[in-house]
Protein backbone atom coordinates (compact mmCIF):
# COMPACT_ATOMS: atom_id res chain seq x y z
CA UNK A 1 0.00 0.00 0.00
CA UNK A 2 1.55 3.36 -0.99
CA UNK A 3 2.46 5.80 1.76
CA UNK A 4 -0.06 8.60 2.42
CA UNK A 5 0.88 11.99 0.98
CA UNK A 6 -0.38 15.07 2.79
CA UNK A 7 0.00 18.72 1.82
CA UNK A 8 -0.02 20.94 4.92
CA UNK A 9 -0.74 24.60 4.18
CA UNK A 10 0.24 27.14 6.84
CA UNK A 11 2.03 30.13 5.36
CA UNK A 12 2.67 32.11 8.58
CA UNK A 13 3.06 33.70 11.05
CA UNK A 14 5.35 32.60 13.91
CA UNK A 15 2.66 32.13 16.54
CA UNK A 16 0.20 30.61 14.07
CA UNK A 17 2.74 28.04 12.91
CA UNK A 18 3.51 27.17 16.54
CA UNK A 19 -0.21 26.60 17.10
CA UNK A 20 -0.31 24.32 14.04
CA UNK A 21 2.58 22.08 15.13
CA UNK A 22 0.54 19.97 17.63
CA UNK A 23 -2.03 19.11 14.96
CA UNK A 24 0.64 18.12 12.43
CA UNK A 25 2.43 16.15 15.17
CA UNK A 26 -0.76 14.13 15.62
CA UNK A 27 -0.86 13.53 11.87
CA UNK A 28 2.76 12.37 11.90
CA UNK A 29 2.14 10.17 14.95
CA UNK A 30 -0.77 8.43 13.22
CA UNK A 31 0.97 8.16 9.84
CA UNK A 32 4.68 7.69 10.65
CA UNK A 33 5.53 6.70 7.07
CA UNK A 34 3.53 9.47 5.43
CA UNK A 35 5.05 12.05 3.15
CA UNK A 36 4.07 15.37 4.71
CA UNK A 37 4.91 18.41 2.58
CA UNK A 38 4.55 21.74 4.39
CA UNK A 39 3.81 24.79 2.26
CA UNK A 40 4.88 28.03 3.95
CA UNK A 41 6.47 31.44 3.43
CA UNK A 42 10.27 31.34 2.97
CA UNK A 43 10.71 33.25 6.25
CA UNK A 44 9.37 30.28 8.23
CA UNK A 45 11.13 27.41 6.47
CA UNK A 46 13.71 27.11 9.28
CA UNK A 47 11.01 26.99 11.94
CA UNK A 48 9.04 24.28 10.15
CA UNK A 49 12.19 22.19 9.68
CA UNK A 50 13.02 22.54 13.39
CA UNK A 51 9.86 20.58 14.20
CA UNK A 52 11.03 17.47 12.36
CA UNK A 53 7.42 16.80 11.39
CA UNK A 54 7.73 17.43 7.67
CA UNK A 55 9.16 15.27 4.91
CA UNK A 56 9.73 18.35 2.78
CA UNK A 57 9.20 22.11 2.95
CA UNK A 58 8.02 24.02 -0.09
CA UNK A 59 7.98 27.80 0.06
CA UNK A 60 5.84 30.34 -1.72
CA UNK A 61 5.67 34.14 -1.92
CA UNK A 62 1.97 34.74 -2.47
CA UNK A 63 2.64 38.31 -3.65
CA UNK A 64 5.08 37.17 -6.34
CA UNK A 65 3.45 35.83 -9.50
CA UNK A 66 6.49 33.77 -10.50
CA UNK A 67 6.56 32.06 -7.10
CA UNK A 68 2.85 31.28 -7.31
CA UNK A 69 3.22 29.82 -10.80
CA UNK A 70 6.15 27.69 -9.68
CA UNK A 71 4.45 26.20 -6.61
CA UNK A 72 1.20 25.50 -8.49
CA UNK A 73 3.20 23.71 -11.19
CA UNK A 74 4.98 21.59 -8.54
CA UNK A 75 1.72 20.72 -6.81
CA UNK A 76 0.17 19.60 -10.11
CA UNK A 77 3.15 17.33 -10.80
CA UNK A 78 2.57 15.39 -7.58
CA UNK A 79 -0.24 13.21 -6.25
CA UNK A 80 -1.86 13.80 -2.86
CA UNK A 81 -4.15 11.98 -0.47
CA UNK A 82 -5.28 15.32 0.91
CA UNK A 83 -4.38 18.96 1.37
CA UNK A 84 -5.12 20.41 4.81
CA UNK A 85 -5.42 24.18 4.99
CA UNK A 86 -4.81 25.12 8.62
CA UNK A 87 -4.77 28.83 7.77
CA UNK A 88 -8.20 29.43 6.32
CA UNK A 89 -7.47 32.42 4.11
CA UNK A 90 -8.09 32.96 0.42
CA UNK A 91 -4.34 32.99 -0.26
CA UNK A 92 -3.82 29.64 1.50
CA UNK A 93 -6.97 27.91 0.22
CA UNK A 94 -6.34 28.81 -3.41
CA UNK A 95 -2.97 27.02 -3.57
CA UNK A 96 -4.17 23.39 -3.32
CA UNK A 97 -7.25 24.35 -5.38
CA UNK A 98 -5.16 25.70 -8.26
CA UNK A 99 -2.61 22.94 -7.66
CA UNK A 100 -5.18 20.32 -8.58
CA UNK A 101 -5.37 18.56 -5.20
CA UNK A 102 -8.66 16.66 -5.35
CA UNK A 103 -9.29 16.30 -1.59
CA UNK A 104 -9.03 19.67 0.15
CA UNK A 105 -9.81 19.88 3.88
CA UNK A 106 -10.48 23.16 5.68
CA UNK A 107 -12.68 24.87 8.24
CA UNK A 108 -16.35 25.63 7.75
CA UNK A 109 -17.51 29.22 7.45
CA UNK A 110 -18.29 29.36 11.19
CA UNK A 111 -14.55 29.35 11.98
CA UNK A 112 -13.10 31.29 9.05
CA UNK A 113 -12.99 35.10 9.11
CA UNK A 114 -12.59 35.72 5.36
CA UNK A 115 -15.96 35.37 3.66
CA UNK A 116 -16.35 32.66 1.05
CA UNK A 117 -13.08 30.77 1.57
CA UNK A 118 -14.72 27.36 2.28
CA UNK A 119 -16.02 27.21 -1.29
CA UNK A 120 -12.48 26.14 -2.24
CA UNK A 121 -12.57 23.08 0.04
CA UNK A 122 -14.09 19.72 -0.82
CA UNK A 123 -14.52 18.90 2.89
CA UNK A 124 -15.45 21.52 5.48
CA UNK A 125 -14.88 20.81 9.16
CA UNK A 126 -17.01 22.27 11.92
CA UNK A 127 -15.22 22.62 15.23
CA UNK A 128 -16.51 23.43 18.70
CA UNK A 129 -13.01 23.70 20.17
CA UNK A 130 -12.03 27.02 21.72
CA UNK A 131 -8.25 27.15 21.33
CA UNK A 132 -6.88 27.49 17.79
CA UNK A 133 -4.40 24.64 18.35
CA UNK A 134 -7.27 22.29 19.12
CA UNK A 135 -9.32 23.68 16.25
CA UNK A 136 -6.39 22.75 14.02
CA UNK A 137 -6.44 19.34 15.66
CA UNK A 138 -9.97 18.78 14.40
CA UNK A 139 -8.67 19.12 10.84
CA UNK A 140 -6.06 16.44 11.54
CA UNK A 141 -8.73 14.19 13.04
CA UNK A 142 -10.84 14.64 9.92
CA UNK A 143 -7.83 13.69 7.79
CA UNK A 144 -7.52 10.41 9.71
CA UNK A 145 -5.29 11.15 12.70
CA UNK A 146 -6.07 9.11 15.81
CA UNK A 147 -5.99 12.20 18.03
CA UNK A 148 -6.12 15.92 17.35
CA UNK A 149 -2.87 17.11 18.91
CA UNK A 150 0.41 15.54 20.01
CA UNK A 151 3.62 16.78 21.68
CA UNK A 152 6.19 18.67 19.62
CA UNK A 153 9.95 18.59 20.17
CA UNK A 154 11.63 21.55 18.47
CA UNK A 155 15.30 21.08 17.63
CA UNK A 156 17.83 23.91 17.96
CA UNK A 157 20.99 23.62 15.83
CA UNK A 158 24.23 23.32 17.81
CA UNK A 159 25.73 26.36 16.06
CA UNK A 160 22.95 28.66 17.26
CA UNK A 161 23.09 27.20 20.77
CA UNK A 162 26.84 27.72 20.96
CA UNK A 163 26.58 31.29 19.65
CA UNK A 164 23.97 32.29 22.24
CA UNK A 165 25.82 30.55 25.08
CA UNK A 166 28.98 32.45 24.18
CA UNK A 167 27.19 35.81 24.17
CA UNK A 168 25.41 35.13 27.46
CA UNK A 169 28.64 33.97 29.06
CA UNK A 170 30.35 37.20 28.02
CA UNK A 171 27.51 39.11 29.68
CA UNK A 172 27.76 36.90 32.81
CA UNK A 173 24.15 35.88 32.36
CA UNK A 174 23.51 32.45 33.83
CA UNK A 175 19.88 32.77 34.97
CA UNK A 176 17.82 35.39 33.20
CA UNK A 177 14.31 36.49 32.28
CA UNK A 178 13.54 37.35 28.65
CA UNK A 179 11.36 40.40 28.01
CA UNK A 180 9.69 40.54 24.59
CA UNK A 181 8.11 44.00 24.21
CA UNK A 182 7.38 43.95 20.48
CA UNK A 183 4.70 42.41 18.34
CA UNK A 184 3.07 42.58 14.94
CA UNK A 185 0.07 44.41 16.39
CA UNK A 186 1.03 47.34 18.61
CA UNK A 187 -2.44 47.13 20.16
CA UNK A 188 -1.40 43.84 21.81
CA UNK A 189 1.82 45.24 23.29
CA UNK A 190 2.37 46.18 26.92
CA UNK A 191 4.11 49.59 27.18
CA UNK A 192 7.90 49.46 26.89
CA UNK A 193 8.21 51.78 29.89
CA UNK A 194 6.50 49.16 32.04
CA UNK A 195 8.83 46.47 30.78
CA UNK A 196 11.68 48.75 31.85
CA UNK A 197 10.17 49.18 35.31
CA UNK A 198 9.72 45.40 35.55
CA UNK A 199 13.39 44.90 34.66
CA UNK A 200 14.40 47.26 37.45
CA UNK A 201 12.12 45.59 40.01
CA UNK A 202 13.40 42.13 39.13
CA UNK A 203 17.03 43.25 39.38
CA UNK A 204 16.52 44.99 42.71
CA UNK A 205 14.33 42.32 44.32
CA UNK A 206 15.69 39.06 42.92
CA UNK A 207 19.08 39.93 41.46
CA UNK A 208 17.99 38.63 38.07
CA UNK A 209 19.08 40.58 35.02
CA UNK A 210 16.75 40.66 32.03
CA UNK A 211 17.45 40.04 28.36
CA UNK A 212 15.40 42.09 25.90
CA UNK A 213 14.37 40.30 22.72
CA UNK A 214 14.59 42.99 20.05
CA UNK A 215 13.02 41.69 16.87
CA UNK A 216 12.71 43.39 13.47
CA UNK A 217 11.45 46.94 13.95
CA UNK A 218 11.78 46.79 17.75
CA UNK A 219 14.87 48.98 18.19
CA UNK A 220 12.90 52.00 19.42
CA UNK A 221 10.93 49.88 21.88
CA UNK A 222 14.13 48.33 23.21
CA UNK A 223 15.68 51.77 23.66
CA UNK A 224 12.65 53.01 25.61
CA UNK A 225 12.74 49.87 27.76
CA UNK A 226 16.41 50.30 28.62
CA UNK A 227 15.90 54.00 29.30
CA UNK A 228 13.09 53.17 31.72
CA UNK A 229 14.98 50.47 33.60
CA UNK A 230 16.63 52.73 36.18
CA UNK A 231 20.11 51.32 35.68
CA UNK A 232 19.07 47.64 35.78
CA UNK A 233 21.18 47.12 32.64
CA UNK A 234 18.91 44.81 30.67
CA UNK A 235 20.85 43.23 27.83
CA UNK A 236 19.35 43.87 24.38
CA UNK A 237 19.69 40.90 22.05
CA UNK A 238 18.90 40.60 18.35
CA UNK A 239 19.53 37.39 16.46
CA UNK A 240 18.17 35.01 13.88
CA UNK A 241 15.31 32.63 14.58
CA UNK A 242 17.55 29.77 15.66
CA UNK A 243 19.37 32.03 18.10
CA UNK A 244 16.06 33.31 19.44
CA UNK A 245 15.04 29.71 20.08
CA UNK A 246 18.25 29.07 22.01
CA UNK A 247 17.78 32.28 24.01
CA UNK A 248 14.20 31.40 24.94
CA UNK A 249 15.04 27.78 25.72
CA UNK A 250 17.63 28.84 28.30
CA UNK A 251 15.46 31.45 30.04
CA UNK A 252 13.98 31.05 33.50
CA UNK A 253 10.85 32.77 32.19
CA UNK A 254 9.66 34.76 29.17
CA UNK A 255 7.38 37.79 29.50
CA UNK A 256 5.43 39.26 26.59
CA UNK A 257 2.08 39.78 24.94
CA UNK A 258 0.16 37.67 22.45
CA UNK A 259 3.19 37.46 20.18
CA UNK A 260 5.26 34.85 18.39
CA UNK A 261 8.20 34.72 20.83
CA UNK A 262 5.88 33.94 23.76
CA UNK A 263 4.24 31.09 21.83
CA UNK A 264 7.67 29.88 20.70
CA UNK A 265 8.88 29.85 24.32
CA UNK A 266 5.86 27.76 25.29
CA UNK A 267 6.63 25.28 22.51
CA UNK A 268 10.18 25.05 23.90
CA UNK A 269 8.73 24.25 27.37
CA UNK A 270 9.98 27.50 28.88
CA UNK A 271 7.57 29.05 31.43
CA UNK A 272 5.86 32.23 30.24
CA UNK A 273 3.98 35.15 31.71
CA UNK A 274 1.64 36.15 28.89
CA UNK A 275 0.00 39.58 28.93
CA UNK A 276 -3.32 39.68 27.08
CA UNK A 277 -5.70 42.49 26.24
CA UNK A 278 -7.73 42.68 23.01
CA UNK A 279 -7.26 39.01 22.06
CA UNK A 280 -8.72 36.12 24.04
CA UNK A 281 -6.21 33.79 25.74
CA UNK A 282 -8.80 31.01 25.74
CA UNK A 283 -8.46 31.02 21.95
CA UNK A 284 -4.99 32.41 21.32
CA UNK A 285 -3.11 31.90 24.58
CA UNK A 286 0.02 29.83 25.27
CA UNK A 287 -0.72 26.23 24.36
CA UNK A 288 0.98 23.31 26.08
CA UNK A 289 0.28 19.66 25.48
CA UNK A 290 -1.11 17.61 28.35
CA UNK A 291 2.30 15.93 28.59
CA UNK A 292 4.11 19.26 29.08
CA UNK A 293 1.58 20.44 31.63
CA UNK A 294 1.84 17.22 33.64
CA UNK A 295 5.64 17.53 33.67
CA UNK A 296 5.36 20.83 35.55
CA UNK A 297 5.54 23.58 32.91
CA UNK A 298 4.15 26.77 34.46
CA UNK A 299 2.43 29.39 32.35
CA UNK A 300 0.62 32.40 33.77
CA UNK A 301 -1.77 34.54 31.74
CA UNK A 302 -2.76 38.03 32.88
CA UNK A 303 -5.80 39.76 31.41
CA UNK A 304 -8.24 42.27 32.85
CA UNK A 305 -11.74 40.94 33.39
CA UNK A 306 -14.56 42.08 31.15
CA UNK A 307 -12.38 42.99 28.16
CA UNK A 308 -14.15 42.83 24.81
CA UNK A 309 -12.23 40.63 22.40
CA UNK A 310 -11.26 42.28 19.13
CA UNK A 311 -8.91 41.36 16.29
CA UNK A 312 -8.79 44.89 14.91
CA UNK A 313 -5.20 45.91 14.30
CA UNK A 314 -4.22 49.27 15.76
CA UNK A 315 -1.00 51.25 16.00
CA UNK A 316 -1.74 52.26 19.60
CA UNK A 317 -1.70 50.16 22.76
CA UNK A 318 -5.17 48.83 23.54
CA UNK A 319 -6.56 50.37 26.78
CA UNK A 320 -6.96 46.92 28.34
CA UNK A 321 -3.19 46.42 28.24
CA UNK A 322 -2.80 49.48 30.48
CA UNK A 323 -4.80 47.79 33.24
CA UNK A 324 -1.97 45.27 33.74
CA UNK A 325 0.34 46.73 36.41
CA UNK A 326 4.06 46.27 36.85
CA UNK A 327 3.45 44.82 40.32
CA UNK A 328 1.04 42.22 38.94
CA UNK A 329 3.55 41.10 36.31
CA UNK A 330 6.39 41.06 38.85
CA UNK A 331 4.34 38.83 41.16
CA UNK A 332 3.53 36.51 38.25
CA UNK A 333 7.19 36.22 37.24
CA UNK A 334 8.18 35.43 40.82
CA UNK A 335 5.56 32.68 40.97
CA UNK A 336 6.65 31.39 37.61
CA UNK A 337 10.33 31.07 38.52
CA UNK A 338 9.81 30.12 42.16
CA UNK A 339 11.40 33.03 43.99
CA UNK A 340 9.88 34.84 47.00
CA UNK A 341 8.18 38.16 46.33
Task: Give, region by region, the residue ranges found by the protein language model.
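Catalytic machinery of carbohydrate-active enzymes
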Residues: 1-341
Amino acid sequence: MPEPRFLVVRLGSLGDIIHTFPAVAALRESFPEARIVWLTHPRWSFLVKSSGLESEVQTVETRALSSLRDVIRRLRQDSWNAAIDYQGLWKSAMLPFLGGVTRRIGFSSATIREFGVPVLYTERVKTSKEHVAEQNGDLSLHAGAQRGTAPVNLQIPEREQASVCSILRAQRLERYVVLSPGGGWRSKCWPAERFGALSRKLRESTGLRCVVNSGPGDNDLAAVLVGSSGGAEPFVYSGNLGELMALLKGAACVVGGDTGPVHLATALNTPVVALFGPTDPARNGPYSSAEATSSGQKNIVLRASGVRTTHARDSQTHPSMLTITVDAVFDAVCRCIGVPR
